[in-house]
């Protein structure tokens, strides 16, 4: 599941006070008023004033904001697409490099407990049936675990979710990393004592737990998330049978589509629940390109929403006090009738209407919503990293060492991811990241492995040049 960076400007001063916002709004209104008044004097065609400025200026400001949003979408959209391509590429490169060099992950030493049926059968029909049963069991486990996660999050069982994620991270960062490091040392014939290996694994795991579940530099957190995704993908590549793996990739794409887009889909319910609570998802589940908040999960900065709500409450209280206490209205606070007459002679009559107040409030909320640049960015689920890498790794392991098929799958996944982000920019809602990329990857794999590669072999055998 992917999210798009908010198409709003990145302000350097994210802690501007409310008075500064109001003063900036008034200053912009005065500039607009002076510009329009000069045009009217030049054309001799005056416009009615409302709240000291032309009535149509608010619409022009909104149109100008829309144009700036489109420009910033083009500017920052491509930047974040590249920022998402880099980690996906790194994860797939780690997996492919391991598959090509470490034979441990291509040997068939067993299967997962979720895939109990073997594919070493006498007939193709039995193998197909066993692969379908294995895929059904695996997808059922994924669906049940996803629903369990949504239920725990909906009922605020945060400690249970944290414990679940911490145990998973411990297994990946300590046990699977130890197995991976040991196999790499065996492959390259590196001699190392167990004490040194234990120190390496201890430091690697502890730093990873701190960076993922607590605090740490962004690049360090991203590196650990990429590494644990690659380790999980390698486990799937080793222990999933070939036909079962391809079938799981096809079915998981359909499930991802249903889970994200259906009104009662588990992932959509998770997003909507987080949006209602203005909460971020757990960092062990999501890769972020910046220190960000899921934009679709919170339609604005939570702090800004609190400020806006406080302003609205203040305005409501002021209105109520004005209606209930007419005596205080006689207290002009220094703004006498002479001052108002002098102001009207310079700026025109000051008439506050519902439309102008709404326009000013909208401008203030837009400024507040675009304050925090650290709350904008792209997020991609770690499951997407894992299944992208499983597809490329399986292609590398089962395509007879053919680099053409591996590269074709790699390019297909990036093309699908780019199209997904393009659709994300159009619809501006959370979209599943697996269907397009996995579909392209499967089509490219089978087309290259069974059509392109035999054709190229025949050309090379007969020494034909095209």
From Swiss-Prot:
Alphabetized UniProt keyword annotations: Apoptosis, Cell adhesion, Cell membrane, Cell projection, Endoplasmic reticulum, Endosome, Golgi apparatus, Hydrolase, Membrane, Notch signaling pathway, Phosphoprotein, Protease, Synapse, Transmembrane, Transmembrane helix
Site annotation Cleavage: residues: 290-292, 297-298, 344-345
Cleaved signal peptide residues: none
Annotated segments matching region Interaction with MTCH1: 463-466
Keyword Repeat among UniProt keywords: no
UniProt-annotated stretches for the region Required for interaction with CTNNB1: 321-449
GO molecular function, one term: aspartic endopeptidase activity, intramembrane cleaving
Membrane disposition: Multi-pass membrane protein
Catalytic residues of the enzyme: 256, 384
Sequence ranges of Polar residues compositional bias: 10-29, 310-327
Sequence motif PAL, location on chain: 432-434
Lumenal topological intervals: 103-131, 189-193, 241-247, 401-406, 453-466
Topological region Cytoplasmic: 1-81, 153-165, 216-219, 272-379, 428-431
A GO term from the CC aspect: aggresome
Post-translational modification: Heterogeneous proteolytic processing generates N-terminal (NTF) and C-terminal (CTF) fragments of approximately 35 and 20 kDa, respectively. During apoptosis, the C-terminal fragment (CTF) is further cleaved by caspase-3 to produce the fragment, PS1-CTF12. After endoproteolysis, the C-terminal fragment (CTF) is phosphorylated on serine residues by PKA and/or PKC. Phosphorylation on Ser-345 inhibits endoproteolysis.
EC numbers: 3.4.23.-
Function field: Catalytic subunit of the gamma-secretase complex, an endoprotease complex that catalyzes the intramembrane cleavage of integral membrane proteins such as Notch receptors and APP (amyloid-beta precursor protein). Requires the presence of the other members of the gamma-secretase complex for protease activity. Plays a role in Notch and Wnt signaling cascades and regulation of downstream processes via its role in processing key regulatory proteins, and by regulating cytosolic CTNNB1 levels.
Name of the featured protein: Presenilin-1
Organism expressing this protein natively: Canis lupus familiaris
Gene (UniProt): PSEN1
